[in-house]
Design a protein with these regions (language model features):
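Short alpha-helix boundary/capping and kink motifs at helix termini
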Residues: 2-30, 34-35, 39, 46-62, ...
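Basic- and aromatic-enriched surface patches that contact anionic nucleotides/nucleic acids
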Residues: 2-8, 15-19, 33, 133-190
Length: 190
């Protein structure tokens, strides 16, 4: 009960702080695509005050899309559309200061430390329609996303299952770079 109350208070503080911080920040840029082959695309994600981390996409299966998101805008959107008192083991966002309490946070940290030779899979982001518009739904990679947000990266790419949601997410939290289909991305390889 106290943890839920603490998270509710931290959530309110984060929403106030992120609302005030957005206009003052310089625009985020897309993460650098550092490797592109038939088997993998790898992006370098700068992490403040520590080594960069790397995210990857692999071709195959159903068509997916890469959307480069502004981390602060995405965090605010996800947090404000999550309940004030999130349920445990849900897709709800928690305040940054509570993200490291996720049971898999240490595993995500270890995976990101593996560097460019063993990049981490892009988080998979979905949505559902709500009375207030669209709400964020994490289908895979929630703890990875927590790690990136807790470490205050400026932007990072995510994977999205369909073109319409890629366009919507890009409008809600994108950095101004059009979403790209995996098929188009992997057709660019040399």
């Amino acid at each position: 009960m106290l943890t839920r109350l603490r998270n509710g208070i931290l959530r309110a503080q984060d929403l106030r702080e992120s609302g005030a911080a957005i206009p003052a920040q310089r625009p985020s840029m897309a993460c650098e695509l550092v490797d592109l082959s038939a088997k993998r695309a790898t992006w370098r994600v700068p992490v403040p005050n520590q080594a960069d981390c790397y995210l990857k996409a692999e071709p195959g299966g159903a068509e997916r899309f890469v959307v480069h998101i502004d981390a602060e805008t995405f965090y605010r959107r996800w947090l404000e559309t999550s309940p004030t008192f999130p349920k445990q083991n849900s897709q709800d966002c928690v305040p940054r200061r509570a993200m490291s309490l996720d049971s898999k946070f240490a595993t995500a940290a270890a995976a990101f430390r593996s560097g460019r030779d063993a990049p981490v899979t892009l988080p998979s982001v979905g949505y559902w329609a709500a009375a207030s518009g669209y709400e964020v739904a994490m289908s895979d990679g929630m703890t990875r996303t927590f790690w990136l947000l807790a470490h205050r990266v400026r932007s990072f790419p995510v994977s999205v299952a369909d073109a319409s949601w890629a366009t919507i997410l890009n409008g809600l939290a994108g950095i101004g770079v059009a979403p790209i289909a995996f098929s188009e991305l992997f057709s660019r390889r040399a």
